[in-house]
Regions:
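Beta-lactam-recognizing serine transpeptidase/beta-lactamase-like catalytic domain environment
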Residues: 1-139, 146
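Short, gly/Ser/Thr-rich active-site loops of penicillin-recognizing serine hydrolases
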Residues: 56-59, 151-174
Length: 174
């Protein structure tokens, strides 16, 4: 999927507001993961891979290292105990990420009963090694918020991946 993002010169005030919380654009899970690699890699965006690579991929500068670090800190607070992302926490590791709950579109615009639940995150925040995006299409269990549906899957998958990759736990993780 190529995704969809209107050209900035065409953004109205209402489009700017909607874009700030994720409406009016579309991205695939791989595109979202690619964007998160810039946060995990000092502002340099990498091409995502599902495989362990023998050589690191070439990156494209996307944002400054300072902005990337600031955003990592913000993402870490998004999984604090009192937030919707708390179910994404991985025991022994500092992680960060963002929940998302997307109303699906139909012929008449946004639906009222069909959702995509999303969690995109980075682990460990102290020395990023993994970007994981969980996207669950049309969850059926009654809950549909990203923090309730996708965040626990992120926690499980990312925790297992960190252990399989022998990433040492953080000493200062909750």
């Amino acid at each position: 999927s190529t995704g969809s993002l209107p050209a900035p010169v065409r953004w109205s005030r209402s489009e700017r507001a909607a874009l700030s919380y994720g409406y009016g654009l579309s991205v695939s899970a791989v595109q979202l993961a690619s964007a998160y690699t810039a946060l995990a890699n000092d502002g340099v965006r990498l091409q995502p891979s599902l495989l362990r690579l023998s050589e690191p991929p070439q990156g494209i500068p996307a944002i400054s290292p300072t902005v990337a670090n600031d955003l990592l800190n913000i993402l870490e607070t998004s999984v604090a105990a009192y937030t919707g992302g708390r179910r994404a926490r991985v025991e022994g590791y500092r992680v960060g990420g963002k929940t998302g709950t997307v109303r699906k579109t139909g012929q008449q615009g946004y639906t009222t009963d069909a959702y995509r639940s999303v969690f995109a995150g980075i682990a460990p925040i102290s020395d990023p090694r993994i970007v994981t995006v969980v996207m669950i299409d049309h969850p059926k269990a009654g809950e549909f918020y990203g923090g309730a549906v996708a965040a626990p899957v992120f926690s499980s998958v990312t925790g297992n991946a960190l252990r399989l990759l022998d990433v040492p736990p953080d000493h200062d993780a909750e």
